[in-house]
């Protein structure tokens, strides 16, 4: 790992890929991942090799501004990379969610001393992940993990869940309760003694995101590794909307993957329908119609995601102006845009994944093809956030001007 004592940063971009190079490298990595995606998912084989390539390609530097030594990619660029990777395997972009949430804060915040250390790690290709959620608590968001003083240092003890991407990462952030009873965060190297990353994620979909548990047993924490998290801050609210769009983009990748699988299946094996006069499946009007509908759905989903990304780009631009009124207006529009996108994109995405089976008969259900992974992955992604609540919040806003949940900086 990079030197933890490193205290300086540089705006010299040497060794950091450009925005265009990252997009090209993402396509190369996706091509490699796609070759074995169905088998990997069927056997639940975590893609450590793919994440090694992602680190080598420095995909995780994309949102770091040029002034801070990065390629200066936009949110639209980053979302595009997610959909490129997701078309090959939607698990891959999903597992990068915590990392890009972390780098968004680096991109938009003033760089303090400790941030300089983290920035150097990001620019070196290191990945960040972690977990806040715990199982077995009375309400979501409750924390039982404890950070206790131990002389001039601290000890961290607890068990986390939904540690998405942590198995592939180099550094992790974890929430805890301090000796004073107040919430506190830590950001520590994941190879530190006492950290055990568990391979116990048992979801029906997104099975290779490494979203299971992490045991924290008497883990040493240094004073400079303490962090604070402000969900209600402006950057925190922006990041919340971006995290939700990240999930939608991962699912959009699965939709594009379903379209690709459908085309390949028709051209290579599918037969005509029983009542068709066509001799081959690619000439069958029933198959053509269904594939056209699948293509339209996939196009609509990608278009929705891209438009929401452009909305969040405008929020990032507003931050650069320092205009409080402009920032607040952009944050509100970003929350609305990502919520609207998820409501409709979820419906279209699941329809596409279901209609994939209409392209063939019983052979389309072959477990070897593993077409059902697309539906399972999409359904799992959209189970992360309460879609019905989003629709209600939007309706309340239009009818009554209520913005409470739109401004709280949480997944609403």
Language-model segments: which ranges?
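Glycine-rich phosphate/cofactor-binding loops in nucleotide/flavin-utilizing enzymes
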Residues: 358-412
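A short core secondary-structure module
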Residues: 162-197
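Generic structural signal for well-ordered, non-transmembrane alpha-helical segments
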Residues: 27, 253-256, 260, 292-299, ...
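C-terminal helix-coil-helix/basic helical segment that borders enzyme active sites and/or dimer interfaces
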Residues: 38-41, 300-343, 357-362
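Glycine-rich phosphate/pyrophosphate-binding beta-alpha loops
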Residues: 161-166, 243-247, 381-384
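Basic/polar N-terminal segments that are highly enriched at the extreme N-terminus
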Residues: 1-24, 412
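Glycine-rich beta->alpha junctions and the first turn(s) of the following alpha-helix
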Residues: 203-299
